[in-house]
């Protein structure tokens, strides 16, 4: 999971460039770890946008060095199916269906699909087969909008 300190470092740079920091993933794969940063803007993201942000973020990461060890940096659009990281993103997509993978089982399942009914504090509520299910954000490994 990405440290909040990294978000604090990245967000002002990305925002000043006219983009929204959608989220980050750090995938530790032995010697070949990956830091993936998702950016967005109202009219969409293209390759040139990713390259521009990559140059600025890479320079900042080289100076600040917030992540130990070697890793590759990838700048990407959230795309489809859009990953969800923060409570405000769940709030933005109230009424949409999502797929969720959890650390600990919820009603015996670690993979769930449902409609976002509410999102506040540290909890989201999904409508799964007409039953409301609360899920703590801290229990979510990954969540994506359904295509």
Swiss-Prot record:
Pfam families membership: DUF150_C, RimP_N
Task performed by this protein: Required for maturation of 30S ribosomal subunits.
Protein name: Ribosome maturation factor RimP
Sequence similarity: Belongs to the RimP family.
NCBIfam families (UniProt xref): PRK00092.1-1
Keyword Cytoplasm attached: yes
Broad class of the protein's primary localization: cytoplasm
Gene Ontology CC terms, in alphabetical order: cytosol
Source species taxonomy: Bacteria, Pseudomonadati, Pseudomonadota, Gammaproteobacteria, Legionellales
Entry keyword set: Cytoplasm, Ribosome biogenesis
Compartment(s) of residence: Cytoplasm
Organism: Legionella pneumophila (strain Lens)
InterPro entries: Ribosome_maturation_RimP (IPR003728), RimP_C (IPR028998), RimP_C_sf (IPR036847), RimP_N (IPR028989), RimP_N_sf (IPR035956)
An individual GO BP term: ribosomal small subunit assembly
Keyword check for Oxidoreductase: no
